[in-house]
């Protein structure tokens, strides 16, 4: 028998949580952080606002949990047998995510609150760690095949692969084209092959 208040997989509590978190992402996408409120989320989710407040004390913690839940969605990482193709495909995947309405909205929210002491401010490191864990095999396989130097840091390589794309979205507002994604992948690969991402002492 379930304890009182326990969240049962597939139960009403779990369904309510899923509906509320989905409503948060939809509100962020449609209206942005400034116009999002517990009340608008509750209305979209079809629940009373007191239901939301019982679980999440404020807007910040509510949005943080929704973003964490969204980050749990795994990306299908490329595994073509060639590091150049893998990195190019990965950059294109990131581009597609960032140019979607939902991806652009959530990324801007994360960036805008990255220095918050709690709530949303704690999500970005968690999201990056999750995505890095997924992408790391691309680098380890490439090292094993002799395509990249031993000791190549997956973290550094992925930062340099994605940074130009985030820069276009968040700083310059330049179009995020497939060509720009391919260029980012090529630049990161060239640096990796040159040993730029091998920490001192590991080479």
Residue ranges and their predicted role:
Residues 1-7, 89, 133, 137-144, ...:
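C-terminal peripheral helix-coil segments that are non-catalytic and often amphipathic
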Residues 1-44, 50, 61:
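Basic, helix-initiating cap at the start of DNA-binding domains
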Residues 20, 35, 58-63, 73-74, ...:
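Short amphipathic alpha-helical segment with a characteristic S/N-K-E followed by hydrophobic residues
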Residues 61, 66-67, 98-125, 136:
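Amphipathic alpha-helical segments used for helix-helix packing
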Residues 75-104:
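Hydrophobic alpha-helical connector segments
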Residues 118-144, 155:
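Amphipathic alpha-helical packing segments from all-alpha helical-bundle domains
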